Amino acid sequence: MSSLTMAAAQQVGVEAKIDSVAIMIGEQAHLQLAITARQGAKIVYPHYKRSQYLVPGVEVLDDSKGDTAVVDGYWSVKKILTLTSFDEQLYAIPGITVKVDGKSYKSNPVALKVI
């Protein structure tokens, strides 16, 4: 897990978005994890290794460092996972857990169809 000291978590948001709901076998999709928290909190998010499976059948090709910005006293952290799969299937990717000041927050689940 990577750790970043950031915002005191009164209002915390964790959202997952995927840039393609369907890809061809071997193509890439990008899953963006967006975290919002008050400045000063400690944010801990998962770190994935190259070739690690996010879920069985969906492989992580790249795990970007968190890109941070300050907006109205809140940290906005964006992290991108580059994914691929070599099996034709509809995959349900569960919410990703992030800790803010020791409290767990989970993103929304996303789906990826490989055709």
Roles of regions detected by a PLM:
Residues 1-3:
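Bacterial N-terminal signal peptides
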Residues 7-115:
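Surface-exposed interaction/ligand-binding surfaces
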